[in-house]
Amino acid sequence: MTTSHPVLGPEGPIRPTAASPDPAPIRAVLFDFSGTLLQIRSYAERIHAVLGEQTADAEVDRLLVGLEAGLADPEVIRAQQGRDVSARAHRHAFTTWYASVPALAPHADALYDQLRTPHHWMPYADTEETLGRLAHEGVAIGVVSDIGWQLPPTFAHHGLDRHVSAWVHSYEHGTEKPDPLLFDLACGKLCAAPQETLMVGDNPYKDGGAAGAGLRSYVLPAGATPGCRRGLDAVLSLVRDSRRESRPSR
């Protein structure tokens, strides 16, 4: 006896499953924001911006070491819990981390405000090209981000907003990825079914978790250098391949 909702054992379904239809063509793509389409400028540049360009490189290096150490600070760790569920929690999480370095504590708010300032962000070298080609091919595009502020001004500053038809900001909904609610909201805004939608990001848990909501997902390696090519051409290949595979054979 087959089932359409299998119970999975360690090696796979316990009972045979009903034949699955071929994967649907991808009609919509959802992107993560930071680390996927754009990246904040380097911490060294940001520190120079708040302390002054005359700050010695050795001093900046010392502060960067302090930020690295701050990630293990118990107070900083506590502040990250639920970071993206509200604007207030988001600011608190980041400013607590910045302030864990005594020399940066007076500048914690200024460093946080850089996050909300469009010119501090850099699109990856292939972001514009990828979004433009997807839009040209009729693919609906959305952005789903764990974040504490509105993203359209940043995209507009870089001329990218015209490609994006849906925005889902975690802080507006009191939850974080991979909550299916966020992916469902984005699919609804794009009038695309989850099985017709691809989620692209750089976090295996948060962005890869879109699979739990019925989407396909593509996860990029984290930690790309600001301004480099991100490898987003693979997204175009996935979309095109899905459409070729869905065409009836002659």
Where are these regions (language model features)?
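Asp-based, Mg2+/Mn2+-dependent phosphohydrolase catalytic module
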Residues: 1-31, 35, 104-106, 128, ...
